[in-house]
């Protein structure tokens, strides 16, 4: 491994959405240090934590249309057959839902579980219940995407939680997403739901940790052998 690769793998970049927060924390550190020098170091630690929260690491994403990758880092909190929210306009029949809960220490970048074109993006206001509750999927503030993937349309729902009060989505209808491509983030703890059509089988278990853009959470059909992965 070259020195450049070592540095790149060690220093994880900060996503641009975090620049203003990191900058504000650092300025606050300078002000605190001017008041009393030891407070500067407290502020600096908080600045480093803020940079850590908005970290945006590269991922090695499997390139196989029969695989569905995790949309976020976190813990698999639910795997259920449920009727998707009305705003997705996907099906009146139950679909496989896999939920990923992100705590404040997880990477909060959200990634496309499959490749495809965005059919719609729908934002809904709502409550800020604990994102681990089942009813958070219908009661909480959320932003929903429908992606027309190679094995059918899927739903991806960003759900705000107790602490998370800001959902960001920079992707728009008609945009083509590659599998593992970044489409948004949620600040300070939240949940991602993925709704999958018939034929998808879960490949994770409740309680398992997932890595956004890398961990295979579901699969269509059977494995066909080695899978190529690309950086995303």
From Swiss-Prot:
Its cofactor is pyruvate. The active site is at 190 (schiff-base intermediate with substrate). Pathway: Phospholipid metabolism; phosphatidylethanolamine biosynthesis; phosphatidylethanolamine from CDP-diacylglycerol: step 2/2. One of its GO terms (cellular component) is plasma membrane. Its main location: membrane. Binds 1 pyruvoyl group covalently per subunit. It comes from the Bacteria. It is found in: Cell membrane. GO terms for molecular function: phosphatidylserine decarboxylase activity. Its EC number is 4.1.1.65. Coiled coil: none annotated. The modification Pyruvic acid (Ser) is found at residue 190. Is synthesized initially as an inactive proenzyme. Formation of the active enzyme involves a self-maturation process in which the active site pyruvoyl group is generated from an internal serine residue via an autocatalytic post-translational modification. Two non-identical subunits are generated from the proenzyme in this reaction, and the pyruvate is formed at the N-terminus of the alpha chain, which is derived from the carboxyl end of the proenzyme. Pfam families: PS_Dcarbxylase. Keywords: Cell membrane, Decarboxylase, Lipid biosynthesis, Lipid metabolism, Lyase, Membrane, Phospholipid biosynthesis, Phospholipid metabolism, Pyruvate, Zymogen. It is a peripheral membrane protein. The record marks 189-190 as: Cleavage (non-hydrolytic). One of its GO terms (biological process) is phosphatidylethanolamine biosynthetic process. InterPro entries: PS_Dcarbxylase, PSD-A. It catalyses: a 1,2-diacyl-sn-glycero-3-phospho-L-serine + H(+) = a 1,2-diacyl-sn-glycero-3-phosphoethanolamine + CO2. HAMAP family: PS_decarb_PSD_A (MF_00664). Catalyzes the formation of phosphatidylethanolamine (PtdEtn) from phosphatidylserine (PtdSer). Belongs to the phosphatidylserine decarboxylase family. PSD-A subfamily. Heterodimer of a large membrane-associated beta subunit and a small pyruvoyl-containing alpha subunit. This is Phosphatidylserine decarboxylase proenzyme. It comes from Allorhizobium ampelinum (strain ATCC BAA-846 / DSM 112012 / S4) (Agrobacterium vitis (strain S4)).
